[in-house]
Structures are given as structure tokens and as C-alpha cells.
A protein has these predicted regions:
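Hydrophobic/aromatic residues within the transmembrane alpha-helices of Major Facilitator Superfamily
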Residues: 9, 13, 17, 50, ...
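Juxtamembrane cytosolic amphipathic helices that cap and anchor the N-termini
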Residues: 3, 104-105, 117
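Hydrophobic/aromatic residues in alpha-helical transmembrane segments
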Residues: 22-26, 85, 123-127, 147, ...
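Selected transmembrane alpha-helices and immediately adjacent juxtamembrane segments
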Residues: 108-126
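Juxtamembrane transmembrane-helix termini in multi-pass membrane transport proteins
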Residues: 2-71, 125-144
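Helical-face signature of the major facilitator-like transporter fold
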Residues: 8, 12, 105, 109, ...
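Membrane helix-loop-helix hairpins that form the core translocation module of multi-pass transporters
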Residues: 35-108, 163-166
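Selective transmembrane alpha-helices of multi-pass membrane proteins
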Residues: 66-93, 150-156, 160, 171-203
Length: 203
């Protein structure tokens, strides 16, 4: 149980703090319209991730008798985590483009997240295999994983919206870089676990 909760927290924090289109939109909406609009953008994954999560998990459950497929998916997930960890350790901050359009923050956030490849790759290669592994132990394990992941993802982006509303320099300062490097190291640890699970399924 603790392992699934820990995985959800670590991956959620990474997804929340890492530079990308959604975080850039959170910051730009905050700068233009205030923290409240940035928080609205941050809430978008609650709506957009659930359909991706359900489809990915349902598909892999139907293929669960084919352990080789799950093994390959898990190894691909581990490689994706290594890629994310590298990007996290080497991060240089967040680039933000400012325009003067109306807020429409939640809608913009939902569109940006739905059109980004990252949620699809994450849930297919990392999220869904973790949920299926959790279901083998208890129905509570996947709920802990998904709940902690989305809670930390949305919560950290909301926190960044509030911080950006008070200090626009945080996302280019040392504390942010240290956070991202620490999260990168944690991701490498989870990549090792996922890779080991993949090899076990291939046997």
C-alpha cells in the first residue's frame, strides 16, 4: 500500500513541478489574470486524465493474460521514466509566453492537457501497469496511487500558481532547480522498479 501511495506522490509532484505546456499556461494565466485563474488551469487534469486513465487501464486489463505485452509496456514505461528523470535533472526553468486574450482558464487548461502527448504516454506505460499491479493486491492500492498522483499533480500546480502570483522569479531560481533534481533522482528509482517488474513479466 505504502509503495503505491509513495509512487503516486512522487510521480504527481514531478508532473506538477515539471516544465511543460500546462505549467507554462498556469504561470501565464497567473501573471495576466491573477492566481485564481492559474489555479483553474491547474485543475484541468482532473477532467482530462480520467478518460485516458480508464481507457488505458481497461485495454491493458484485457491484455493482462499476455504477460509479454505487459512486460514490454512496463519496460517502455521505465525507459520513459529515465527520460523524464534526465529532463528533470537538467531543467533550466519555465518559459512563459504572455498574450492578452480573455481568461477561459479551465477550458484552455483542458485543451492543452488533452492535446499534450505526455498524459497518454504516462497512463499507458506507467499509470495503467501500476494500477493493474495494485489490483492484484487490493482495490485500495490503485485508489491510493491515482488519488495521490492527481492530488499532488494538481496541488503542486496550484501552489506554483500562488507562488508565481507573489514572486515571478521562483521558477528560474535555485530552489526550483533543486526540487526538480531531487524529483529526477526519485524517478530513476521508480524506473528501476518498473524495469524489474517488466523483466519479471517477460520470463
Amino acid at each position: 500500500m505504502i509503495a503505491f501511495l509513495s509512487a503516486g506522490i512522487a510521480l504527481g509532484l514531478y508532473a506538477g513541478f515539471s516544465p511543460g505546456p500546462l505549467l507554462a499556461l498556469v504561470i501565464s494565466q497567473t501573471i495576466k489574470h491573477g492566481p485564481k485563474e492559474g489555479v483553474k488551469v491547474a485543475l484541468a487534469p482532473i477532467m482530462t486524465d480520467f478518460p485516458i486513465l480508464l481507457v488505458s487501464t481497461t485495454l491493458l486489463i484485457r491484455l493482462s493474460d499476455y504477460k509479454m505485452i505487459l512486460g514490454i509496456v512496463s519496460i517502455l514505461g521505465a525507459l520513459f521514466l529515465v527520460y523524464l528523470a534526465y529532463g528533470s535533472i537538467k531543467t533550466r526553468g519555465v518559459e512563459v509566453n504572455i498574450d492578452q486574450e480573455g481568461p477561459y482558464s479551465f477550458i484552455k487548461g483542458a485543451i492543452v492537457n488533452a492535446l499534450s502527448p505526455s498524459p497518454y504516454v504516462f497512463w499507458i506505460t506507467i499509470g495503467a501497469p501500476t494500477i493493474i499491479k495494485g489490483l492484484a493486491e487490493s482495490y485500495i492500492a490503485p485508489l491510493l496511487f491515482v488519488g495521490s498522483f492527481l492530488g499532488c499533480l494538481v496541488g503542486s500546480k496550484c501552489l506554483l500558481a500562488v507562488i508565481a502570483g507573489k514572486s515571478k522569479h521562483f521558477l528560474t531560481g535555485r530552489p526550483y532547480f533543486y526540487i526538480m533534481r531531487a524529483l529526477g533522482i526519485v524517478l530513476l528509482a521508480f524506473a528501476f522498479v518498473l524495469f524489474k517488474d517488466g523483466l519479471r513479466l517477460l520470463k
